[in-house]
């Protein structure tokens, strides 16, 4: 274990201990202090109870399919739009105010507006895609625009096929930007998707479980579902980035 990992572990243990002490202090002061702040032990116990049920995994899968589906949809669309914007200056100008608006408007506003157009079942997919689109588009566009023009001119003069140009010139330049955008987008899509589910309350979603726990003051459940969302987000990010790195390695990038 290196020093950096060791420091992170101690930091996590410190905050878990602080959380446990705060929960115990509230329980000592108030008759029902656990309603205000569940202890880490209670949350872990409740998470274990939930994790052995089929309903828990159905709920996780329900949300994961829609949120990650929105991420994939936005990623494909953003890459295509970035390529077109790099090729056509007028299209880049056309996209600029739209991307700026999506970045500036609060996600809650988009969620409420989207509920006018969509049913709650598809809300998290749409909102996740909407939040992922700007960072992937902008990073992809920057990567393409920073491609060495001398290499492109040389490829044009020697009539290098498009496939070889993509692999030998564009991909090595764009992939670092793409990887950064993917890492950022995966975090954004889960935050936005969970917010959409909490507001839209689609049946069978993790957002609905969070809202129900809040209504009935089931604080341990509230923390357990929050931990689940964070854990699933981290797992998806690690797996997807590992896949990207593997593909880059196979392509010799």
Please annotate each region the language model reported:
Residues 3-30:
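N-terminal signal-anchor transmembrane alpha helix
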Residues 26-72:
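Periplasmic/extracellular loop-to-transmembrane helix junction in inner-membrane transport proteins
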Residues 139-178, 210:
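Short cytoplasmic-facing helical segments at TM-TM junctions of multi-pass membrane proteins
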Residues 100-135, 142-143:
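Generic hydrophobic transmembrane alpha-helix motif, especially the helices
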Residues 69-99:
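Transmembrane-helix boundary motif in ABC transporter permease subunits
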Residues 89, 180, 224-253:
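C-terminal transmembrane helix and the adjacent membrane-cytosol boundary/short C-terminal tail
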Residues 126-130, 162-196, 224, 240:
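Transmembrane alpha-helices
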Residues 116, 144, 192-229, 252-253:
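Glycine-rich helix-loop "coupling/hinge" segments at transmembrane-helix boundaries
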């Amino acid at each position: 274990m290196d020093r950096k990992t060791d420091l992170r572990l101690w930091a996590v243990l410190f905050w878990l201990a602080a959380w446990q002490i705060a929960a115990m202090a509230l329980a000592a002061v108030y008759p029902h202090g656990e309603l205000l702040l569940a202890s880490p032990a209670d949350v872990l116990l409740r998470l274990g109870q939930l994790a052995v049920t089929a309903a828990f995994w159905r709920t996780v899968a329900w949300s994961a399919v829609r949120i990650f589906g929105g991420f994939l949809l936005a990623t494909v669309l953003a890459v295509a739009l970035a390529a077109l914007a790099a090729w056509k200056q007028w299209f880049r100008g056309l996209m600029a105010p739209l991307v700026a608006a999506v970045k500036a408007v609060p996600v809650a506003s988009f969620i409420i507006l989207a509920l006018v157009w969509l049913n709650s079942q598809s809300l998290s997919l749409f909102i996740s895609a909407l939040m992922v689109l700007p960072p992937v588009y902008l990073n992809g566009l920057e990567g393409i625009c920073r491609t060495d023009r001398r290499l492109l001119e040389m490829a044009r003069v020697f009539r290098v096929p498009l496939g070889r140009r993509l692999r030998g010139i564009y991909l090595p330049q764009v992939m670092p930007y793409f990887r950064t955008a993917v890492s950022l987008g995966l975090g954004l899509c889960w935050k936005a998707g969970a917010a959409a589910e909490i507001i839209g309350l689609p049946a069978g979603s993790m957002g609905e479980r969070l809202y129900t726990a809040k209504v009935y003051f089931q604080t341990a459940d509230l923390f357990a579902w929050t931990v689940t969302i964070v854990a699933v987000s981290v797992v998806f990010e690690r797996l997807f980035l590992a896949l990207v790195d593997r593909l880059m390695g196979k392509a010799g990038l």
